């Protein structure tokens, strides 16, 4: 669906190591000096979903295809990025194109890896990044306000937009992000956001990069990040990027055994991918045939014809009905035939809102 998650953080927090592990590549050079990521590294990542494997156990398809999310490793920034310091201009331009921000925060002690501020202070790091996002939004908004003031005489819409923009600027100048702006659901704000893509309005996932010894019991640094995320009504993940990067070279069975030895069911990166998918407001439905079992990505709240259109636009144009089985019923009755026999196969029309996990077969005519 062309949706992307931008990975950000100060230099040397483990951002590129996180990206390397996420993408199961070594694309982003991981080095102990600032700005080793200058051009954004991009990669398409499978979204872990154990339901696909369960469906495949029943259907025995030739192949399994996952939903995917694009991750973008964006160059580290420093204080003053909004004014072009460091690689600030590149950073801000690249992050504007992302729908969700994954903020990696250093929560590990290691004298061999320098910190840009010479000390480990995760809340200060978070404040630095989020302040730069707000300052960048102010700079962007100032330019739009100038254009709106010039358009007042010739445009009827300019007045409402200008009032909203000025109110938002006051809010931002109080160092509050756009996501807490009281009018952020108004038509005027949404129009401004669609055009300007305010950085401080984007959803944020906080990733505490901890040492291996702190995976099961969070250290004080990570606890501070977790509490901050909770206060922001944002998601939080703790992981050891170095460890996750090392797992890239392991087989699936080795990874499973290794995670069991750590006392966890899934890696921090698997959780990160899932949460990113969730924060994008996406759900999955499935198609299950002998050729392939496949996960399809749609926005939550999509109708059956819209879901069909993800496969092919002709499916949406000529939509007749959707033969629907819930995932739980498909598994419980061991496939389509069993579900049909038990009366669990439903015929849904164009007004049906597809649910996460639906197994669908579309009928259409063009």
Language-model features: where?
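Switch/coupling subdomain of P-loop NTPase systems
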Residues: 96, 100-103, 108-136, 140-143, ...
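A structural signal for alpha-helical segments
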Residues: 33, 86, 121, 153-160
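Conserved nucleotide-binding/hydrolysis micro-motifs of P-loop NTPases
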Residues: 25, 51-52, 76-78, 106-112, ...
């Amino acid at each position: 669906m062309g949706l992307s998650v931008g990975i950000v953080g100060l230099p040397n927090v483990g951002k590129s190591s996180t990206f390397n592990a996420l993408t199961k590549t070594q694309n982003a050079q991981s080095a102990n000096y600032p700005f080793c990521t200058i051009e954004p590294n991009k990669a398409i990542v499978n979204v872990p979903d154990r339901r696909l494997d369960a469906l495949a156990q029943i259907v025995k398809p030739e192949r399994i295809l996952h939903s995917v999310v694009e991750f973008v490793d964006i160059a580290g920034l420093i204080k003053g990025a909004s004014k072009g310091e460091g690689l600030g201009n590149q950073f801000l331009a690249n992050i504007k194109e992302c729908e969700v921000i994954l903020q990696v925060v250093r929560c590990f002690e290691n004298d061999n890896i320098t910190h840009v501020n010479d000390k480990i202070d995760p809340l200060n790091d978070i404040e630095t990044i989020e302040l730069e996002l707000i300052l960048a939004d102010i700079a962007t908004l100032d330019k739009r306000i100038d254009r709106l003031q010039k358009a007042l005489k010739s445009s009827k819409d300019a007045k409402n937009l200008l009032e909203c923009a000025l109110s938002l600027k006051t809010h931002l100048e109080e160092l509050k992000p756009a996501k807490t702006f009281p009018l952020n659901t108004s038509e005027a704000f949404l129009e401004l956001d669609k055009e300007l893509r305010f950085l401080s309005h984007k959803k944020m996932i906080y990733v505490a990069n901890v040492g291996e010894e702190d995976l099961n019991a969070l250290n004080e640094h990570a606890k501070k990040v977790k509490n901050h995320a909770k206060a922001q009504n944002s998601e939080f993940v703790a992981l050891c990027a170095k460890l996750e990067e090392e797992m890239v070279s392991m087989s699936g069975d080795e990874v499973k055994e290794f995670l069991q030895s750590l006392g966890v069911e899934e890696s921090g990166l698997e959780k990160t991918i899932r949460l990113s998918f969730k924060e994008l407001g996406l759900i999955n439905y499935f198609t299950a045939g002998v050729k392939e079992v496949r996960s399809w990505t749609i926005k939550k709240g999509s109708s059956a014809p819209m879901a069909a259109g993800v496969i092919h636009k002709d499916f949406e144009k000529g939509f007749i009905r959707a033969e629907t089985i819930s995932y739980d019923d498909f598994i419980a009755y061991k496939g389509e035939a069993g579900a049909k026999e038990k009366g669990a196969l439903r015929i849904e029309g164009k007004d049906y809102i597809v649910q996460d996990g639906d197994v669908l077969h579309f009928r259409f005519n063009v």
